[in-house]
Amino acid sequence: MPARPAIALAALLLCSGLAGAQDASFGQRLYRDKADCQFCHGVNGDGRGDPRSPGKAPDLHRTRLDREQLIEVIACGRPGSEMPHFDKYAYDAKDCYGLSAEELGKNIPPDPHSTSLNKREISALADFILATFVGK
């Protein structure tokens, strides 16, 4: 392989590794700070959150949710539970579980106690949870 393509390939591989590390760091900051998932799910994702959290959160190591399902749960919350929805537009239409806010009534997931997340942040958070906790 000529030197220039080899250098370009090495640079590409290095950058992709850095991007992965940056994505993981971004997801970790969302988990621990912005979304404050650790408040309920615990720093280690084991469901041992703060005693002041609204309820027992699932152990993320044991979840069977795939990426798309995890994204939906983060965006839409869990109807009838304390799991908040982090997409501020979650129930404006029928984007969550095919249901509207009116149809859910009192079972609508609560607003997040911290802040809402955009689609990029929701995806990064799901990727962090999958890479860090699920099945480990």
Annotate each PLM feature.
Residues 1-8:
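Bacterial N-terminal signal peptides that target proteins for export
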Residues 92-136:
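C-terminal capping alpha-helices of c-type cytochrome domains
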Residues 34-35, 41, 77-78, 87, ...:
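Sec/Tat-exported extracytoplasmic proteins
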Residues 19-21:
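Boundary at the C-terminal end of the N-terminal hydrophobic targeting segment
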